[in-house]
């Protein structure tokens, strides 16, 4: 995970001090890209322990098209709790946009199903793009999409994914985002009969919150360990049929977790 650690160090050393929506304050850079070859191991940060259950269940929740935290709460995942209303609703966030984007004529579009079908039909297409940034529905969202657009690319029988993330909380959020989209790439590849290539992560405003500086410095003192591997149930070939039990991360041996507050 050298690219991630290089980003941490660069922002600590060269980032600009900026105010932000939460009032916490950040150190930030604009425009940063990381590339991970998914054949070299699963890109899961090892210099601190990540909560795997949250990463996997959140992605399955997105793919269900769900926007209520009930499913997450049932599986002891709390990462969206701060933004939900009293009924657990978040408005038309990621799951709604991925699976039920509302077009100008009011017809709902299943972007993810279209994506799987289009990769099979036309793998050389330059239009294999999914967007969560639905301008007309942004005001109704509890949190506007941070990881807002992603594109797939097929060459030599391998599927690569590039994510554009407009805003990245480097210490807490970005490690989750890397793992989530790497996992999604593997799942889409299996559903379309392809191997995996690269995951490319492009960040707009990449920032460290001011109350994460010491945690980031502590993380940078740790020596990275070998990357784990991902094992998917080979019998699952429908992207929307994956369950938690079908996904296994093997050989994950991280350093201890480092606690840090979430900026809401």
Curated annotation (Swiss-Prot):
It catalyses: dUMP + (6R)-5,10-methylene-5,6,7,8-tetrahydrofolate = 7,8-dihydrofolate + dTMP. Its EC number is 2.1.1.45. Pathway: Pyrimidine metabolism; dTTP biosynthesis. It is found in: Cytoplasm. GO terms for biological process: dTMP biosynthetic process; dTTP biosynthetic process; methylation. One of its GO terms (molecular function) is thymidylate synthase activity. InterPro entries: Thymidate_synth/dCMP_Mease (IPR045097), Thymidate_synth/dCMP_Mease_dom (IPR023451), Thymidate_synth/dCMP_Mease_sf (IPR036926), Thymidylate_synthase (IPR000398), Thymidylate_synthase_AS (IPR020940). Pfam families: Thymidylat_synt (PF00303). It is an enzyme of class 2 (transferase). It comes from the Bacteria. DUMP binds at residues 21, 126-127, 166-169, 177, 207-209. SUPFAM superfamilies: Thymidylate synthase/dCMP hydroxymethylase. One of its GO terms (cellular component) is cytosol. Keywords: Cytoplasm, Methyltransferase, Nucleotide biosynthesis, Transferase. (6R)-5,10-methylene-5,6,7,8-tetrahydrofolate binds at residues 51, 169, 263. The active site is at residue 146. The keyword Nucleotidyltransferase does not apply. Homodimer. Belongs to the thymidylate synthase family. Bacterial-type ThyA subfamily. Catalyzes the reductive methylation of 2'-deoxyuridine-5'-monophosphate (dUMP) to 2'-deoxythymidine-5'-monophosphate (dTMP) while utilizing 5,10-methylenetetrahydrofolate (mTHF) as the methyl donor and reductant in the reaction, yielding dihydrofolate (DHF) as a by-product. This enzymatic reaction provides an intracellular de novo source of dTMP, an essential precursor for DNA biosynthesis. PANTHER family: THYMIDYLATE SYNTHASE, THYMIDYLATE SYNTHASE 1. This is Thymidylate synthase. The lineage of its organism: Bacteria, Pseudomonadati, Pseudomonadota, Gammaproteobacteria, Lysobacterales. The gene is thyA.
């Amino acid at each position: 995970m050298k690219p991630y650690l290089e980003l941490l160090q660069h922002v600590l050393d060269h980032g600009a001090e900026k105010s932000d929506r939460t009032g916490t304050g950040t150190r930030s850079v604009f425009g940063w890209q990381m590339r991970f070859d998914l054949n070299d191991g699963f890109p899961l940060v090892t210099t601190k322990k990540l909560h795997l259950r949250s990463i996997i269940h959140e992605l399955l929740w997105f793919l269900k098209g769900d926007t209520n935290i009930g499913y997450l709460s049932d599986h002891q995942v709390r990462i969206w709790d701060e933004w939900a209303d009293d009924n657990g609703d978040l408005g038309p966030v990621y799951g709604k946009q991925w699976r039920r984007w509302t077009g100008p004529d009011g017809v709902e579009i299943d972007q993810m199903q279209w994506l799987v079908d289009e990769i099979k039909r036309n793998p050389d297409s330059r239009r294999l793009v999914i967007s969560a940034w639905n301008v007309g529905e942004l005001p109704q969202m509890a949190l506007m999409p941070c990881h807002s657009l992603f594109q797939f690319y097929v060459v030599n029988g391998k599927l690569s994914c590039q994510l554009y993330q407009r805003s990245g909380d480097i210490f807490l959020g970005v490690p989750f985002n890397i793992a989530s989209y790497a996992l999604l790439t593997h799942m889409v590849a299996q559903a379309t009969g392809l191997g995996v290539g690269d995951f490319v992560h492009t960040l707009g405003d990449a920032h460290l919150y001011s109350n994460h500086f010491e945690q980031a410095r502590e993380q940078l003192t740790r020596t990275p360990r070998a990357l784990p591997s991902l094992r998917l149930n080979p019998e699952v070939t429908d992207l929307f049929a994956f369950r938690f039990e079908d996904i296994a991360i093997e050989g994950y041996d991280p350093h201890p977790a480092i606690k840090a507050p979430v900026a809401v």
